[in-house]
Curated annotation (Swiss-Prot):
Name of the protein described by the UniProt record: Lipoyl synthase, mitochondrial
Organism per entry: Pyrenophora tritici-repentis (strain Pt-1C-BFP)
The organism's taxonomic lineage, starting at the top: Eukaryota, Fungi, Dikarya, Ascomycota, Pezizomycotina
Subcellular location per the Swiss-Prot or TrEMBL entry: Mitochondrion
PROSITE patterns: RADICAL_SAM
Catalytic activity: [[Fe-S] cluster scaffold protein carrying a second [4Fe-4S](2+) cluster] + N(6)-octanoyl-L-lysyl-[protein] + 2 oxidized [2Fe-2S]-[ferredoxin] + 2 S-adenosyl-L-methionine + 4 H(+) = [[Fe-S] cluster scaffold protein] + N(6)-[(R)-dihydrolipoyl]-L-lysyl-[protein] + 4 Fe(3+) + 2 hydrogen sulfide + 2 5'-deoxyadenosine + 2 L-methionine + 2 reduced [2Fe-2S]-[ferredoxin]
Any one annotated GO CC term: mitochondrion
NCBIfam families: lipA, PRK05481.1, PRK12928.1
Radical SAM core domain ranges (all copies): 146-367
Chain residues that bind [4Fe-4S] cluster 2: 163, 167, 170
Binding annotation for [4Fe-4S] cluster 1: 132, 137, 143, 378
InterPro entries per UniProt: Aldolase_TIM, Elp3/MiaA/NifB-like_rSAM, LIAS_N, Lipoyl_synth, rSAM
Organelle transit peptide: 1-30
Cofactor(s) essential for the protein: [4Fe-4S] cluster
Pfam families documented for this protein: LIAS_N, Radical_SAM
Amino acid sequence: MATSIPRSRCFLTSSTLKVVPRSRTPLRSFATTSDTPQTSVPEAPGKRSRPPTSFSDTLNAGPSFGDFVNPNAPLSPTEAYEIKTVQVGPEGRKKTITRLPEWLRTPIPSNANQNYKQIKKDLRGLNLATVCEEARCPNISDCWGGSSKSAATATIMLMGDTCTRGCRFCAVKTSKAPPPLDPHEPENTAEALRRWGLGYVVITVVDRDDLADSGAHHIAETIMKIKQKNPTQLVELLGGDYGGNLEMAKVVARSGVDVFAHNIETTERLTPFVRDRRAKFRQSLDVLRSAKEERPELITKTSMMLGLGETDEDLWHALRELRANNVDVVTFGQYMRPTKRHMAVHDYVTPDKFELWRQRALDMGFLYCASGPLVRSSYKAGEAFIENVLKKRRLGSSAGKNDVAELSAAEEVGKAL
């Protein structure tokens, strides 16, 4: 019986295999491939060349990696004054907010700085408050962390850390019945200033409408104790309006203070919308004028915030009123919203406009004007200039035109600090 081959293997027999001749017809080319022969360009070993694109050209013309990691990289004029906005919030409820301009950004305070740590330690040990912390001043890292301890500055706030008024721009705590005055505060303040060894100090106060004298005698006692511990110490006081009681303003003026400062904060038109209802533009002018009348040699000073919606005519009017009341020094700074509970910023004023108003104030006859986005009531260039003027007066030098002539030199000193 013949052996039968399995059916499944029949397909593998040689009789069933057919040789298919290789086609000599050329393969069909793809539509994107050119039929013309391409000449190959020799490439550099280890490097592939890519054709340039508009995207790569844009990247090459833009900022480099160093521009992103270097915070001090210079900006173009267009970028420097550009106001940027951003959309925040959940979908359907997004709102547009304005980002902080480049010229208003400041370094974060660091405890690594020895001067910063020492000043903070002294203040805590003596139970003293500063307006630097309470008002969230943007210059605290510069003032508390000066190049040397003598160059560091802290503005001490007297009569506690709670104010009886509620201005719409201010971050200081408010209460109708703040804690009573600390009877040891004058001595503690004088001792802290003696430890620091500063030549020029700034003291500010909260408004205390709950006190019969608005705290005038407490302030005067503090200044006198400071002078007792260091007779050459120059003291600037940034005080309130004492509820319109001009006699209390004169009590402070007679205490031995060297610079009598009281801020009008804004223009007369905007005062009812910016300051507490008990603070009035004319009342502030009366306080400054009465201090000058009590002591004609006293330097009087005030400060204004820009960016609240004021017009040029509003500012001209305010400056004319200040000169009519013999105010010597004026400063301009940008209003910066402390929290969302406070009034919003109307606009961010450019550094060029601040410089313009500085020149205008000097042309009107002010002894000194500090003007800039980050300038506050206590400003180092202003302190350096006023300190120089006061020392010359003590030596019997004239302080009129010579003081103004030394303005630029004093500003350089302030920048160096």
